[in-house]
Amino acid sequence: GIQRIPAGEVTSQFRIWFNPSLQSQIFMVPAIVGLLLSLVTLLLTSLAIVKEKEIGTLEQLIVTPIKSYQLIAGKLIPFVILGFVSVIIVLTGMKFIFKIDVKGDVIFLFASSFIYILSTLGLGLLVSTFSKTQQQAMMLAVFAIMLPLVFLSGFAFPVENMPEIFQDISVIIPLKYFLLIIRGVILKGAGFAEHWQDGLAMF
């Protein structure tokens, strides 16, 4: 006859990928790259250009024979370089202090950083056009742009856990996509194939 074999016990176990020890710094430290880039490029750009307005040198630069794009490039290139220096410093500290290595495509990481720097420089220019003093620029940059960038980007907690209206607003937040890229590259070993759409969304 047919011999019945008793079924064995089935046990389920949770398996946590990419951060099995549940250390908060592994999740938060890569995101500091995005936060630092936002602070350096957005605030310094808006303050530097508004300062030129206050002391009257911006008008003098405008009437010079240089073209407008040359003037803008001359003002923004130093902040692009400063942004890349900030990325290198944070990645170095992340490796030697927190023992977190970049597992994915480093070239894609720096290319994404460049795109994000361009987007925040644009926001800094936008702030400078609406500000007449450095104090106005600081207040506008921090309260109108930086706070939404941080709280709606998934920096501290997942966007998926937010109310639906905030999830809809987060679609226009460039830091959200940059954090997806940087966490994917550093923690998951991802690259261009997984995050090219996030890179396009930052434009």
Which ranges hold each PLM region?
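Short helix-to-coil transition segments within interhelical loops
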Residues: K51, Q60-S68, F130
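Transport-system extracytoplasmic interface segments
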Residues: G1-L44
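Hydrophobic alpha-helical transmembrane segments that constitute the membrane-spanning cores
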Residues: L42, G74-F98, S119-G124, S128, ...
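Selective transmembrane-helix segments that form parts of the transport pathway or gating/packing helices
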Residues: I66-G93, F110, F114, G199-F203
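Short alpha-helical transmembrane interface motifs in multi-pass membrane proteins
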Residues: I26-P30, S38-L43, A73-P78, G104-S112, ...
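A hydrophobic alpha-helix feature that marks transmembrane segments and, especially
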Residues: L35-T57, L125, T129
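Membrane-spanning alpha-helical segments of multipass transporters and channels
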Residues: D101-F203
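Residue-level hotspots within the lipid-embedded alpha helices of multi-pass solute transporters
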Residues: N19, I32-L36, L44, A48, ...
